[in-house]
Amino acid sequence: MATKTLKVTQTKSSIGRLPKHRASLLGLGLRRINHTVEVEDTPSVRGMINKVYYMVSVEEV
């Protein structure tokens, strides 16, 4: 069975944000504005996305 993937794009800067939110961005593999990564749709990834929802956009692939 194929796992779902999510396309996550950073839309805002991490400068001046909480350290936990910066760590979540790094955990997702995002390093700069307009950087896009594809990640597996798991509960831990969803949790990181929910923490930084205001800095990222998410699409299902």
Swiss-Prot record:
This is Large ribosomal subunit protein uL30. It comes from the Bacteria. PANTHER family: LARGE RIBOSOMAL SUBUNIT PROTEIN UL30M, MITOCHONDRIAL RIBOSOMAL PROTEIN L30. Transmembrane segments: none annotated. The gene is rpmD. Gene3D superfamilies: Ribosomal protein L30, ferredoxin-like fold domain. SUPFAM superfamilies: Ribosomal protein L30p/L7e. GO terms for biological process: translation. NCBIfam families: rpmD_bact. It comes from Shewanella halifaxensis (strain HAW-EB4). Part of the 50S ribosomal subunit.
